[in-house]
From Swiss-Prot:
The keyword Transport does not apply. It is found in: Cytoplasm. SUPFAM superfamilies: P-loop containing nucleoside triphosphate hydrolases, RecA protein, C-terminal domain. NCBIfam families: tigrfam_recA (TIGR02012). Belongs to the RecA family. GO terms for cellular component: cytosol. It comes from Aggregatibacter actinomycetemcomitans. ATP binds at G67, P68, E69, S70, S71, G72, K73, T74. The gene is recA. This is Protein RecA. Keywords: ATP-binding, Cytoplasm, DNA damage, DNA recombination, DNA repair, DNA-binding, Nucleotide-binding, SOS response. GO terms for biological process: DNA recombination; DNA repair; SOS response. Pfam families: RecA (PF00154), RecA_C (PF21096). The keyword DNA repair applies.
Length: 352
């Protein structure tokens, strides 16, 4: 019978072989907080950046963001574009749904004059454009909205009742095989937005699945499940959504973390709300009763007033954010993220 030392040697050899064959980060201990040296782009949500473990979405990788309708998928990707533009990166938006609203994008902080936009006629055209942009090496972030709208040419040209079983899945599988190595070489972040469908006849387990077959689930380095879990009200008026994002797959840091944040209508992700919560948790901001204070100075009664103070004092807000980012990215396990169980085989599931 093998001794513990021999078992450890065998395990180290196996892990070394796996990393050699599949790349660093293909396997790690679940509690391992060591982050890979990968360039990342902020998502616009401080809490989500921490949950991802490397400070944002990884460059040179494929990312899938999926969820129900009106859950904040496009808002999150536009927020990524806004953050990427702040660092001088070139962005492209492949709008297969033909639903991009430039006015809404500008409200989220996107400089609408700069991003490249394409509204392709079919799925093949969309993925060819994506491939050409990646191969150019000049585009840093590409958003494909959405996989469900990547309709194969044969389906568009066919009659309404024709059967095209598995056509979209084959298209995605072929495209991702071509794209993966090019994306890595170009150090380009490609984000696919995806929708949810219900599997028919599922008696046990989760009936939800994403469109476009299984290829994207395998090729994506990060998969984010985004859900609306509540409403934000000001009096009787609904002014935004409480949003929850679960990292169901992560090949660059430990997965299965989740985070809550607010999306305000016409403004996007509320950074001030996250800064207040994290600031209180890590004692940068003090709270006594309903009052919030920063450096012994009262900044507001109630969270709404404290958030307003941060908006009116951007220098202090920036200092609080940079202090928290430096501290928490070094120890992401102490952040406002909760590790949750992987509920289904592919990580898709309802939140508990």
């Amino acid at each position: 019978m093998a001794t513990q030392e021999e078992k450890q040697k065998a395990l180290d050899a196996a892990l070394g072989q796996i990393e050699k064959q599949f790349g660093k980060g293909a396997i790690m201990k679940l509690g391992d907080s060591q982050k890979l040296d990968i360039e990342a782009i902020s998502t616009g949500s401080f809490g989500l950046d921490l949950a991802l473990g490397i400070g944002g979405l990884p460059m040179g990788r494929i990312v899938e963001i999926f969820g129900p309708e009106s859950s904040g998928k496009t808002t999150l990707t536009l927020s990524v574009i806004a953050e990427a533009q702040k660092t001088g990166k070139t962005c492209a938006f492949i709008d297969a749904e033909h639903a991009l609203d430039p006015i809404y994008a500008s409200k989220l902080g996107v400089d609408v004059k700069e991003p490249l936009v394409s509204q392709p006629d079919n799925g093949e055209q969309a993925l060819e454009i994506c491939d050409a942009l990646v191969r150019s090496g000049a585009v840093d972030v590409i958003i494909v909205d959405s996989v469900a709208a990547l309709t194969p040419k044969a389906e568009i040209e066919g009659d309404m009742g024709d059967s095209h079983m598995g056509l979209q899945a084959r298209l995605m599988s072929q495209a991702l095989r071509k794209l993966t190595s090019q994306i890595k070489n170009a150090n380009c972040l490609v984000i696919f937005i995806n929708q949810i469908r219900m599997k028919i006849g599922v008696m046990f387990g989760n009936p939800e699945t994403t469109t476009g077959g299984n290829a994207l689930k395998f090729y994506a380095s990060v998969r984010l499940d985004i859900r609306r879990v509540g409403s934000i009200k000001e009096g009787d008026e609904v002014i935004g959504n409480e949003t929850r994002v679960k990292v169901v797959k992560n090949k660059v840091a430990p997965p299965f973390r989740q985070v809550d944040f607010q999306i305000l209508y016409g403004e996007g992700i509320s950074k001030e709300s996250e800064l207040i919560e994290l600031g209180v948790k890590h004692k940068l901001i003090s709270k006594a009763g309903a009052w919030y204070a920063y450096q012994n100075e009262k900044i507001g009664q109630g969270k709404t007033n404290a958030m307003k103070w941060l908006k009116d004092n951007p220098e202090q807000a920036k200092f609080i954010e940079s202090t928290l980012r430096d501290e928490l990215l070094a120890h992401p396990e102490s952040a406002i993220t909760a590790e949750v169980e992987d509920e289904a085989g592919n990580g898709e599931g309802d939140f508990e």
